Amino acid sequence: MSTSGHLFRWRRLALVLSIAMAGCASDQDKGAAISAVNQAFQADYEAMLADKGVRTYKVRRTDAFVALHATFAKLGMRIADQDPDLGTLTADAAAPRPLNAQEWQQAAAVDLPRMREIARPHVGMLAEMIRFEPEGLEIVIHAAVLDADGGSEVSLTTRMRETAPPRTNMPRREYPPPTGVRLALDKIWRQFEQELRAARKIP
């Protein structure tokens, strides 16, 4: 049998095992597993935002807003809502953007084993079927630009929005993977500063 044939058989076997193991865990067990994951990821998410979610720049608020707008466009995200007067902007895109596929896998390599470890006491071997699939999700980034002493304070938050039900029999978590959040924030800030430099607003 060809390599592709073996791969197809293994995928079918994995699907059968997933269905079988899903039947061994009650909805209450699955809910408890995702609740535990959400609690852990929420703590990581809030710590990440406190550390990386806010920066201050010696630029005018209007210049920062324009640079943010360009940043999200360069990263392949759609501007869903904006209010230049208030300094707020919302961008979204199909997951894994603003990460690329390689960056998403990098996040999954760190966060997926931890997620399975958290879920395992509640659902047993079903935890091994948990995936960090980007399908059926959109990433939403909220940005705000406020006047600060001699410049502007820029803040970022992120969340996931479901556009299709998960392919597995597990409910979705509410919080994005912590490593994914870190990579996304770092990427946005890098692009934002490139836009400011291109406009000669910062050295």
Label each region the model flagged.
Residues S2-A14:
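Bacterial N-terminal signal peptides that target proteins for export
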Residues A20-G23:
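C-terminal motif of bacterial Sec signal peptides marking the signal peptidase cleavage site
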Residues A25-P203:
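Ser/Thr-rich, low-complexity intrinsically disordered terminal regions
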